[in-house]
Amino acid sequence: MLENRVKTKQIFIGGVAIGGDAPISTQSMTFSKTADIESTKNQIDRLKLAGADLVRVAVSNEKDALALKELKKVSPLPLIADIHFHYKFALIAAQSVDAIRINPGNIGSKDKIKAVVDACKEKNIPIRIGVNAGSLEKRFDQKYGPTPKGMVESALYNAKLLEDLDFTDFKISLKASDVMRTIEAYRMLRPLVIYPFHLGVTEAGNLFSSSIKSAMALGGLLMEGIGDTMRVSITGELENEIKVARAILRHSGRLKEGINWISCPTCGRIEANLVDMASKVEKRLSHIKTPLDISVMGCVVNALGEAKHADMAIAFGNRSGLIIKEGKVIHKLAEKDLFETFVIEVENLAKEREKSLKD
């Protein structure tokens, strides 16, 4: 059951609203050296094209921090500076970026946090309190270990620090590398604060592993109404982080956009290379943002029944196939004409739906 979203305080990262009634945003992180502006800009461009709303960049040294001024000028996405250990890099970064992420486990003393807060106040930019189970402050780690309780106590302590400094433009993340600790931590903290949540499973692994962990943890939280922005962390291509994140948003009921793909798992009746064809169809129609149910079936035997609830379906037969629109066969074509005709029909249907929504 899809629950209503928890209403949180709204903050802004550049022009992107986080929390309140704002759509749930997606983000990723570049892996280039931030001071290499050309490479970093290219990666940000890729993320923009993939549909990302925000981007985070590592600030590992003073050179990275100083490069942010020029990077900000060319970035098509709001920039978040990721700071570990060296609070002075945050002071430099705050002059140029749209938000600062700090790890309370390694940023340092209250005085250092105050300096970061003062810099963010001056530029009117928000902070993310980025709690990680693997790098909790010593006192919380010794008392609780890398547990949900330890993460929550760290978040509450640091939220209170910022509040005492009269600073409330912040969001919170509670990241662990497994599903259960991630879910439990966010559930535990949600009723205790009004601030927006950044969701994520940290160090989640490769595309396969991360997709499963993230779908279970983030998808479950999203269905409970928890979460305002998110990152799917993948050891792999940048674009996959956004692709998987947006799929999780769609299938958790939080994003009404794009195609819901339906395809049979294959059996002895298939009369085409369905694996290749399904991949080809999905890639060719990936640009469509209109909500549609599209079915790709490996034989005509089951297609008429199984695809009847799809907006559009393609069924491959022996050197021929069917195109089915809203349960009715509209084309029976030779194999050579089937694919391109199907693409045209789906694109036309998307245009029809968009027009009807505007009218």
From Swiss-Prot:
It comes from Helicobacter pylori (strain P12). Converts 2C-methyl-D-erythritol 2,4-cyclodiphosphate (ME-2,4cPP) into 1-hydroxy-2-methyl-2-(E)-butenyl 4-diphosphate. Belongs to the IspG family. The keyword Oxidoreductase applies. The keyword Iron-sulfur applies. Its EC number is 1.17.7.3. It is an enzyme of class 1 (oxidoreductase). Binds 1 [4Fe-4S] cluster. InterPro entries: Dihydropteroate_synth-like_sf, Enolase-like_C_sf, IspG_bac, IspG_bac-typ, NO2/SO3_Rdtase_4Fe4S_sf. Pathway: Isoprenoid biosynthesis; isopentenyl diphosphate biosynthesis via DXP pathway; isopentenyl diphosphate from 1-deoxy-D-xylulose 5-phosphate: step 5/6. [4Fe-4S] cluster binds at residues 264, 267, 299, 306. Its cofactor is [4Fe-4S] cluster. This is 4-hydroxy-3-methylbut-2-en-1-yl diphosphate synthase (flavodoxin). Pfam families: GcpE. Keywords: 4Fe-4S, Iron, Iron-sulfur, Isoprene biosynthesis, Metal-binding, Oxidoreductase. One of its GO terms (molecular function) is iron ion binding. It catalyses: (2E)-4-hydroxy-3-methylbut-2-enyl diphosphate + oxidized [flavodoxin] + H2O + 2 H(+) = 2-C-methyl-D-erythritol 2,4-cyclic diphosphate + reduced [flavodoxin]. One of its GO terms (biological process) is isopentenyl diphosphate biosynthetic process, methylerythritol 4-phosphate pathway.
